[in-house]
Amino acid sequence: MRLIPLATAEQVGKWAARHIVNRINAFKPTADRPFVLGLPTGGTPLTAYKALVEMHKAGQVSFKHVVTFNMDEYVGLAKEHPESYHSFMHRNFFDHVDIPAENINLLNGNAPDIDAECRQYEEKIRSYGKINLFMGGVGNDGHIAFNEPASSLASRTRIKTLTHDTRVANSRFFDGDVSQVPKYALTVGVGTLLDAEEVMILVLGNVKAQALQAAVEGNVNHMWTISCLQLHPKAVVVCDEPSTMELKVKTLKYFNELEAENIKGL
């Protein structure tokens, strides 16, 4: 696992965006061989999306031959709802870059057959071979996507019940009203995530410090979903300074020295 320790949330977003752009450009995608990118929602990736849009407008990257798969979507929330992940992605990213509509893949939380929707999503991912790079965030309790604590590390795209803590955390997007936050969501599984060629997780703020410590210094444990990254051959964790509060000094020193060349110029 790589750990990229940076000072601020803005630097985390810029580093992540630069990493994605470098990966896309090195891949040299075409219509017949697109770059497949997994994407998250929430507050954490906003600076990364902003930086990606800026780099696109500066001519540094094109998303014309990029295919995206989003991590999750609420169940029962109309896709036109301002807090649906469909709306979030278009508002913060898709509407500002040159990605073709047919290349965008989002789970349908209102599908008449939820099991079929989840199965078809997995099949579509497999039809591209694999996801080349999956970017994600992490919850205070270590969840990735909506793989809450005790999720199977072999899980696939499915419906999940959201914990009360997750709904409280997400209520900030619903005027602070927990009752407005859906109780269920469709989410890619931990196994889906681990199948990606590369996984990049962004960690921001002191509320995520325990999760980061579990990911980097703890054991692989289904109660801390983020610890699954230890099983991945190409995992990158990009974090800001407040999120490193629970790490040992020698751990942080080790990664700062290891990644010194890669964190310049931000």
UniProtKB/Swiss-Prot annotation:
Identify the keywords attached in UniProt to this record, alphabetized: Allosteric enzyme, Carbohydrate metabolism, Hydrolase
Per its UniProt entry, which superkingdom is the organism in? Bacteria
Task: Give me the reactions it catalyses.
Answer: alpha-D-glucosamine 6-phosphate + H2O = beta-D-fructose 6-phosphate + NH4(+)
EC class name: hydrolase
Active site, renumbered: D72 (proton acceptor), D141 (for ring-opening step), H143 (proton acceptor), E148 (for ring-opening step)
Q: Any known activators or inhibitors?
A: Allosterically activated by N-acetylglucosamine 6-phosphate (GlcNAc6P).
Q: Where is this site: Part of the allosteric site?
A: S151, R158, K160, T161, Y254
Q: Which CDD domains does this entry report, sorted A to Z?
A: GlcN6P_deaminase (cd01399)
- Record InterPro entries: Glc/Gal-6P_isomerase, Glucosamine6P_isomerase, Glucosamine6P_isomerase_CS, NagB/RpiA_transferase-like
Q: GO cellular-component terms in the record?
A: cytoplasm
Instruction: Please provide, alphabetically and separated by semicolons, the GO molecular function terms listed in this UniProt record.
Output: glucosamine-6-phosphate deaminase activity; identical protein binding
Q: Which PANTHER family does the record associate with it?
A: GLUCOSAMINE-6-PHOSPHATE ISOMERASE
The protein's role, per its UniProt record: Catalyzes the reversible isomerization-deamination of glucosamine 6-phosphate (GlcN6P) to form fructose 6-phosphate (Fru6P) and ammonium ion.
| Annotated protein name in UniProt | Glucosamine-6-phosphate deaminase
Q: Which organism is it from?
A: Enterobacter sp. (strain 638)
